[in-house]
């Protein structure tokens, strides 16, 4: 299977970053690996990650990205999954624009492609220096 050889991480929206950080860092004891005002990534066992991002309008809705697989060649994985019938999402909005394959490029050369499962949950594959 294409994705079975890659690590998976989870990411989801929070409505209040300070409150979320107090819980994840203070109560759960998670270690910060990437820190910015609206995005925090925690490094867990065996390099697995939990990513939270500030997006109050998406909290509790299926538009959240629920899991993300870290890959080292996103173009190849997008092509392989497309061949298997996966349809990638396309976005053209402030802060999130995808190319014709459905790949968005972010600061630091991070690349992400989003797709949905049969229930409409948003999942992604990501290529970034930390994956």
PLM feature spans:
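A short, glycine- and basic residue-enriched loop/turn
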Residues: 11, 38-39, 112
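Conserved short beta-strand elements that form part of the metal-binding/catalytic scaffold
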Residues: 31-72, 89-90, 108, 122-127
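Short Gly/charged-rich anion-binding patches and loops
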Residues: 19-20, 37, 76
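Helix N-cap motif at beta-to-alpha junctions
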Residues: 16-17, 71-75
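N-terminal beta-strand motif that seeds the catalytic metal site of vicinal oxygen chelate
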Residues: 1-19, 49, 65-67, 126-131
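Amphipathic alpha-helical segments
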Residues: 18-31
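Vicinal oxygen chelate
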Residues: 1-3, 78-131
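Short amphipathic alpha-helices within nucleic acid-binding modules
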Residues: 23, 75-80
């Amino acid at each position: 299977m294409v994705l079975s050889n890659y690590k998976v991480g989870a990411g989801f929206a929070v409505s209040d970053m300070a409150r979320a950080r107090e819980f994840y860092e203070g109560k759960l004891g998670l270690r910060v690996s990437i820190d910015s005002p609206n995005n925090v990534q925690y490094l867990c066992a065996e390099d697995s990650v939990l990513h939270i991002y500030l997006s109050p309008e998406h909290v509790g809705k299926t538009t959240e990205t629920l899991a993300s697989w870290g890959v080292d060649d996103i173009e190849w994985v997008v092509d392989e999954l497309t061949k298997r019938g996966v349809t990638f999402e396309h976005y053209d909005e402030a802060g999130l624009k995808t190319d014709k394959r459905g790949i968005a490029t972010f600061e630091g050369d991070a690349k992400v492609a989003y797709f949905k499962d049969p229930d409409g949950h948003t999942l992604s594959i990501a290529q970034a220096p930390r994956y």
